[in-house]
């Protein structure tokens, strides 16, 4: 069985590009950011949204196996078809786990040795994500705090669900980014 794929959808937040130039109909990702100091330019600004990605049932099944959360609403298509959702849905924590990869689709962060998760606040799973749905990440850099060897970032994250006025997920995400050593 072939998994459905998301159609190409042009981004609408291109006026946030550093140059200020809008490029109609072009997905302008990833944005190149040069080192942890380059993040300063994006403080209090939203990055252009990432590309749409399909979340296939195979990913949901793999997440169920990896975590042991095999609740039928995630893995039993026949039973889920008769549920309030009408199909299987992704685990909320699977949707949450997509955040780092979605940011990498938005940003090419150069001269950074590594990034690590520091925490997640105010996570809300707003809209269920059906198997085969198209999602994309939207990120706003709200705070930068210097730390030894790098910077702590505070992002407001919104994972959009194609065809829904409400997001699939909203959260505050804290990471630590460490500069390359000279």
Model-predicted segments: where are they?
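Catalytic strand-loop segment that frames the active site of acyl-thioester-processing enzymes
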Residues: 17, 24-90, 107
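Generic structural detector for well-ordered beta-strands
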Residues: 48, 52-54, 124, 174-176
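Predominant activation on well-ordered alpha-helical scaffold segments within soluble catalytic domains
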Residues: 61-64, 96-100
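A generic structural signal for short beta-strands and their flanking turns/coil linkers
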Residues: 49-51, 59, 69, 112-121, ...
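Hydrophobic beta-strand-centered segment that forms part of the acyl-chain substrate-binding groove
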Residues: 83-87, 94, 100-138
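HotDog/MaoC-like acyl-thioester-processing domains
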Residues: 2-41, 128-182
């Amino acid at each position: 069985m072939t998994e459905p794929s998301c159609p190409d959808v042009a981004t609408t937040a291109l006026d946030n590009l550093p140059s200020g130039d809008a490029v109609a109909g072009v997905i302008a990702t990833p944005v190149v950011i040069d080192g942890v100091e380059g993040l300063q330019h994006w403080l209090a600004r939203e990055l252009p949204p990432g590309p749409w990605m399909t979340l296939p049932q195979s990913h949901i099944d793999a997440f169920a196996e990896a975590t042991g959360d095999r609740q039928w609403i995630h893995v039993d298509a026949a039973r889920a078809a008769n549920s309030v959702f009408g199909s299987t849905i992704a685990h909320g924590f699977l949707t949450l786990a997509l955040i780092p990869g979605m940011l990498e689709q938005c940003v090419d962060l150069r001269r950074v040795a590594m990034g690590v998760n520091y925490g997640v606040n105010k996570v809300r799973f707003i809209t269920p994500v059906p198997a085969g749905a198209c999602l994309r990440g939207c990120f706003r850099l709200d705070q930068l705090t210097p730390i030894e060897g790098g910077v702590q970032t505070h992002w407001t994250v919104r994972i959009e669900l194609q065809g829904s006025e409400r997001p699939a997920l909203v959260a505050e995400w804290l990471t630590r980014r460490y500069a390359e050593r000279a």
